[in-house]
């Protein structure tokens, strides 16, 4: 009996490292290291889907470079994922750019204007410091002046700008770009190590949320 017990103990001891390795493999990325847990989860727009929300700023060169990776990645997201963007608003100049984003969305020209606004600020070095400069950019790309002014100054756009600012603050965003997964997790280059890894961590967290919904 003693020999049997000793054999079982030896076998159990030998298997412990394998079990530990299996746990490590299952948790490919670690909270607090590769991503951050949002202390108080933020409600999502559609609880039936996994929300992915990029917090960005048109004046951020890192956000502009991230677009080349983010855009094709976002297009490949499955049907159970709701992809959103939230323009950051930390100071008055950023509010101008956020309102440009929501105005473009309201007018149905966001798909075209999103990259145009980025290019204007990052390559052409336009400050887009006020409404008139935003209006001029839109008019130069085919939007009627009356339409863009009406949208930019609308209650809806102003409300969305305030709500987006509040949402980003609730996420605890530290910089741009950051990706928020289902209002629960925050992914940044600082934690993930690179923009490429941000998307890998995001994929991991999307899968994590999907498995939790089953």
Can you say where each PLM-predicted feature lies in the sequence?
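Extracytoplasmic thiol/disulfide redox context detector
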Residues: 2-92, 170, 207-214
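Conserved strand-to-helix beginnings and helix N-cap segments that scaffold or border functional pockets
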Residues: 64-67, 94-98, 192-195
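Solvent-exposed loop/turn segments at secondary-structure junctions
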Residues: 59-62, 89-93, 119-124, 154-157, ...
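C-terminal cap of thioredoxin/glutaredoxin-like
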Residues: 5, 140-214
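Sec/Tat-exported extracytoplasmic proteins
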Residues: 56-59, 70, 74-77, 104-108, ...
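Extracytoplasmic/secreted envelope proteins and their assembly/folding machinery
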Residues: 67-74, 97-101, 114, 131, ...
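Structural microenvironment flanking redox-active thiols in thiol-disulfide oxidoreductases
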Residues: 76-107, 111-139
